[in-house]
Amino acid sequence: MIPVIALVGRPNVGKSTLFNRITKTQDALVADFPGLTRDRQYGHAQHENKSFIIVDTGGIGVDDIEVDTLMSRQSQVALNEANVILFLVDGRSGLTGIDQQIAQALRKLNKKVHLVVNKTDGMNEDIACADFQSLGITDVHAISASHGGGISSLLEEILEPFTTETHEATDDKAIKIAFAGRPNVGKSTLINRILGEERVVVYDMPGTTRDSISIPFTREDKQYVLIDTAGVRRKSRIDEKIEKFSVIKTLQAIKEAHVCLLLLDANEGITDQDMNLLGFIIESGKALVIAVNKWDGLEEDHKEKIKSELSRRLHFANFAKIRFISALHGSGVGGLFKDINEAYHSAIQSFSTPKLTRLLQDISAKHTPPCINGRRIKLRYAHLGGHNPPVIVIHGNQLDALPESYKRYLNNEFIKHLGLVGTPLKIEFKGGQNPFANKKNKLSQRQVNKKKRLMRWAKSKK
């Protein structure tokens, strides 16, 4: 299971800054496209090939809320799900009474807690940390969230117990499908419809009701595992913070899956919660199929309105197939597995270096890269850098100056010519390095003698 790291601390100690710093340490699969919203209370991050989910529990001890609310429902869910807790304090302000109360509450959780002393830039780290020795937390780290100091070593230590997991499946293994979406969007109805059609005898439901439910079954001699996730609910005013953490199980299921099936409600259209979930799926690089449920019985003008909204708001996910279905009546459900298999096989495909290089040459010849300071950017060769999602590594010169518009052009052309369906594509650029950079030019003996003659001649002319 993907580890969960929770950030805890009083307000203004730098939790949001650290959260943003950590979630941006990975090479983002997608840019912040207009219209793609994210709930920044949780996020996906990666450090040295180890993926994890990070959660910001918000400030404690503000707005006249007692520190005991740490143990209340609004933070209890997140802290119970967390594998590691990072307790942030302010190295400049020193130890406060609220810090002491939070530490006392954390001790009751029986969780691994790391004390993170923030804002230590320009300070003696030992002196800054010494003020917090009375809290009795042995694992202490001095960092600067705003400047990035100490964060890499912090992540390295807290992730050390967790193994590097790869989720590249082969054809002889079951394809894991995560059914994601808001409550009442029809996830369970759709799964029951699929199971009913396939007449599955085995129905395994491990864990508690709060856990994701994994259901193995066979369809046309292929093995699948359906993962019924907890719904991402709309945030009410009272339970706003509670609802932010109800998504953790869903996010873990998405990270474990090979393909994500995002279910939307045709009656409600695309909500902010849908966009949050879609953003996380794309960030995670997962193969994706979108199903618009409750399509039966809608007026034609409403159907056209929904299609227009999908085209307008989901342009950044145009690689994904969209199906219009009715989980209750079964219409359109049969075509979902065709899309799921296409997306899965696109995500794990392999391409040879000669094929990718020839394709790169054809694409760049069709629309040549721009010139920078009178020199044209050169794209030399390409090779495969990974699977699920597919990663193509392009080598060349002056690639740092390659415009974003041309990068999008390359991405779209590779997707089209490789026939990728239902999976995002990541392209990495690596510029050529001068092998003689920072090396002193060693002269031959003949060149040394000539240099001496020139120097003697120059002196004789003075």
From Swiss-Prot:
<feature type="binding site">
    <location>
        <begin position="228"/>
        <end position="232"/>
    </location>
    <ligand>
        <name>GTP 2</name>
    </ligand>
</feature>
<dbReference type="InterPro" id="IPR016484">
    <property type="entry name" value="GTPase_Der"/>
</dbReference>
<dbReference type="InterPro" id="IPR027417">
    <property type="entry name" value="P-loop_NTPase"/>
</dbReference>
<dbReference type="GO" id="GO:0042254">
    <property type="term" value="P:ribosome biogenesis"/>
</dbReference>
<dbReference type="InterPro" id="IPR005225">
    <property type="entry name" value="Small_GTP-bd"/>
</dbReference>
<keyword id="KW-0690">Ribosome biogenesis</keyword>
<keyword id="KW-0547">Nucleotide-binding</keyword>
<feature type="binding site">
    <location>
        <begin position="181"/>
        <end position="188"/>
    </location>
    <ligand>
        <name>GTP 2</name>
    </ligand>
</feature>
<feature type="binding site">
    <location>
        <begin position="293"/>
        <end position="296"/>
    </location>
    <ligand>
        <name>GTP 2</name>
    </ligand>
</feature>
<feature type="domain" description="KH-like">
    <location>
        <begin position="349"/>
        <end position="433"/>
    </location>
</feature>
<protein>
    <recommendedName>
        <fullName>GTPase Der</fullName>
    </recommendedName>
</protein>
<dbReference type="InterPro" id="IPR032859">
    <property type="entry name" value="KH_dom-like"/>
</dbReference>
<comment type="similarity">
    <text>Belongs to the TRAFAC class TrmE-Era-EngA-EngB-Septin-like GTPase superfamily. EngA (Der) GTPase family.</text>
</comment>
<dbReference type="GO" id="GO:0005525">
    <property type="term" value="F:GTP binding"/>
</dbReference>
<feature type="binding site">
    <location>
        <begin position="9"/>
        <end position="16"/>
    </location>
    <ligand>
        <name>GTP 1</name>
    </ligand>
</feature>
<feature type="domain" description="EngA-type G 1">
    <location>
        <begin position="3"/>
        <end position="166"/>
    </location>
</feature>
<dbReference type="Pfam" id="PF01926">
    <property type="entry name" value="MMR_HSR1"/>
</dbReference>
<feature type="binding site">
    <location>
        <begin position="118"/>
        <end position="121"/>
    </location>
    <ligand>
        <name>GTP 1</name>
    </ligand>
</feature>
<comment type="function">
    <text>GTPase that plays an essential role in the late steps of ribosome biogenesis.</text>
</comment>
<comment type="subunit">
    <text>Associates with the 50S ribosomal subunit.</text>
</comment>
<keyword id="KW-0677">Repeat</keyword>
<dbReference type="Pfam" id="PF14714">
    <property type="entry name" value="KH_dom-like"/>
</dbReference>
<keyword id="KW-0342">GTP-binding</keyword>
<dbReference type="GO" id="GO:0043022">
    <property type="term" value="F:ribosome binding"/>
</dbReference>
<dbReference type="InterPro" id="IPR031166">
    <property type="entry name" value="G_ENGA"/>
</dbReference>
<feature type="domain" description="EngA-type G 2">
    <location>
        <begin position="175"/>
        <end position="348"/>
    </location>
</feature>
<dbReference type="InterPro" id="IPR015946">
    <property type="entry name" value="KH_dom-like_a/b"/>
</dbReference>
<feature type="binding site">
    <location>
        <begin position="56"/>
        <end position="60"/>
    </location>
    <ligand>
        <name>GTP 1</name>
    </ligand>
</feature>
<dbReference type="InterPro" id="IPR006073">
    <property type="entry name" value="GTP-bd"/>
</dbReference>
